[in-house]
């Protein structure tokens, strides 16, 4: 394979920039920049870099990783330079004379091709890079440690063990007894049950990776946009005394106790003849159905006249808020018609911590086990595992052993696609195309 190079750190002014070179000719970097110092593997070496005119480009730290003991499994040279745009540009220009610029995710792709990481670990790398909260990072790190790979490889090996027994029975049909068939059926049912339990996870891993959606719902002028802006810590939604100001769905990302929360502002729900407002209300109701959790807003002045359409939205995913509670001193829940409301006044900054704590408790009750157990984190993984289950479900022991064996092979292949034992160009493009250049 050709030798590639790229800037690994973000482009722009910084204290330090890191430029990575990987490939069989990576050590030519030393000769090209006229590095006279003896560079030893895994030792940081301070040295000047020279251009063709023997002018100093920069004084850098060089780190050399010899194959196969590197991230990519190839010879790797890292140049730790000053983060000057001019210096970075000059070094990249020099490297471009002898090497090929790396594409997005190409270093990680080479790590995969050289058996340094499987596909689940490769996906975890990009998830860690994109993580914005502690829980997202923890999930990615756990996956990078191989928790998913070990789980899928375990199921794969169990299927291979069953397949081996099947092949033996095909070669020695006289050994096939009703007990042997029952034992194989029992083992396959156990594997299938484990796979189905893994699939029936409420998509918790994917939700944690993408963000937990919390929709703010209520009548017009119930303080939804005011609360939304307060949680976002900036003015995103237009706040007005006129009812029906919010028409479209707005989103902002916040961090609550390390969990990635996407707060959604919606149009006020009421009867309206305005077609534009009607569309906003329709979208609000859709968000009420699809959101992971809901904040139901009721203005304090309307506590004695509950809107049935709003009350009907309340379920076990809901947190009820009595908004505009400026005159209420208590921090305790207020019970109205057997519904507990958190009194909140945004303008007086009252009840906000109570609300955030309530959101945290709801989220932790649903997602805390994500911090200890390996969960599916991508649609790609889910599709292949579901395919494996479907194949196992369709196995009939009334068919010849040869056909059952073929179905088992297909199921094994689906699990192999998850970790990348079997891969094709489309799968690799889908996984590694999400990476930035330099990773």
From Swiss-Prot:
Its required cofactor(s), as named, are: K(+)
Note accompanying the cofactor annotation:
Binds 1 potassium ion per subunit.
| Binding residues for GTP | 221-226, 240-246, 265-268
Any one cellular component term from GO for this entry? cytoplasm
Subcellular location(s) of the protein = Cytoplasm
UniProt: Mg(2+) binding residues: 225, 246
Keywords in alphabetical order, please.
Cytoplasm, GTP-binding, Hydrolase, Magnesium, Metal-binding, Nucleotide-binding, Potassium, tRNA processing
- Gene3D superfamilies according to UniProt: P-loop containing nucleotide triphosphate hydrolases, Probable tRNA modification gtpase trme, domain 1, tRNA modification GTPase MnmE domain 2
Q: Which residues bind (6S)-5-formyl-5,6,7,8-tetrahydrofolate?
A: 20, 78, 116, 439
* Any single biological process term in GO: tRNA wobble uridine modification
One matching Pfam family: MMR_HSR1
One GO MF term attached to the UniProt entry: GTP binding
- Residues of the TrmE-type G domain: 211-364
Q: SUPFAM superfamilies in the record, alphabetically?
A: P-loop containing nucleoside triphosphate hydrolases, TrmE connector domain
Where is it predominantly found?
A: cytoplasm
What are its E.C. numbers?
3.6.-.-
Q: What does this protein do?
A: Exhibits a very high intrinsic GTPase hydrolysis rate. Involved in the addition of a carboxymethylaminomethyl (cmnm) group at the wobble position (U34) of certain tRNAs, forming tRNA-cmnm(5)s(2)U34.
Q: Which family does it belong to?
A: Belongs to the TRAFAC class TrmE-Era-EngA-EngB-Septin-like GTPase superfamily. TrmE GTPase family.
- Cite the record's note on assembly: Homodimer. Heterotetramer of two MnmE and two MnmG subunits.
The identity of this protein, by name, is: tRNA modification GTPase MnmE
Gene label: mnmE
């Amino acid at each position: 394979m050709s030798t590639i190079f790229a800037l690994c750190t973000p482009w722009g002014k910084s204290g330090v920039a890191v430029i990575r070179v990987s490939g069989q000719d990576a050590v030519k970097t030393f000769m090209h920049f006229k590095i006279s110092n003896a560079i030893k593997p895994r030792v940081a070496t301070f040295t000047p870099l020279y251009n063709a005119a023997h002018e100093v480009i920069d004084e850098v730290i060089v780190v050399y990783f010899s194959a196969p003991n590197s991230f990519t499994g190839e010879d790797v040279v890292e140049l730790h330079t000053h983060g000057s745009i001019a210096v970075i540009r000059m070094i990249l220009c020099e490297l471009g004379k002898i090497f090929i610029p790396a594409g997005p995710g190409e270093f990680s792709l080479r790590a995969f091709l050289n058996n340094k990481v499987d596909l689940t670990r490769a996906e975890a790398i990009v998830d860690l890079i994109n993580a914005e909260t502690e829980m997202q990072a923890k999930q990615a790190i756990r996956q990078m440690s191989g928790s998913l790979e070990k789980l899928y490889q375990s199921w794969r090996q169990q299927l291979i063990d069953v397949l081996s027994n099947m092949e033996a029975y095909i070669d020695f049909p006289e050994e096939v007894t009703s007990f042997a068939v029952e034992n194989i059926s029992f083992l396959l049912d156990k594997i299938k049950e484990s796979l189905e339990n893994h699939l029936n996870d409420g998509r918790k891993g994917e939700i944690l990776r993408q963000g937990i959606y919390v929709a703010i719902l209520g009548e017009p002028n119930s303080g939804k946009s005011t609360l939304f802006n307060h949680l976002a810590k900036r003015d995103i939604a237009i706040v007005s005394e006129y009812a029906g100001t919010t028409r479209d769905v707005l989103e902002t990302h916040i961090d609550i106790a390390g969990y990635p929360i996407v707060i959604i502002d919606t149009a006020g729900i009421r009867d309206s003849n305005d077609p534009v407002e009607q569309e906003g209300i329709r979208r609000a109701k859709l968000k009420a159905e699809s959101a992971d959790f809901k904040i139901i807003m009721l203005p304090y002045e309307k506590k004695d006249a509950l809107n049935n359409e709003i009350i009907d939205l309340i379920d076990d995913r809901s947190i009820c808020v009595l908004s505009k509670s400026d005159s209420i001193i208590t921090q305790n829940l207020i019970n109205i018609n057997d519904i507990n409301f958190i009194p909140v006044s945004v303008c007086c900054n009252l009840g906000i911590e109570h609300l955030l704590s309530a959101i945290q408790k709801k989220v932790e009750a649903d997602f805390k086990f994500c911090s200890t157990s390996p969960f599916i984190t991508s649609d790609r993984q889910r599709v292949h595992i579901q395919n494996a289950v479907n194949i196992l479900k369709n196995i009939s022991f009334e068919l010849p052993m040869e056909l059952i064996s073929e179905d088992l092979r297909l199921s094994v292949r689906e699990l192999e696609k998850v970790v990348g034992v079997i891969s094709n160009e489309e799968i690799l493009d889908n996984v590694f195309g999400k990476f930035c250049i330099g990773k």
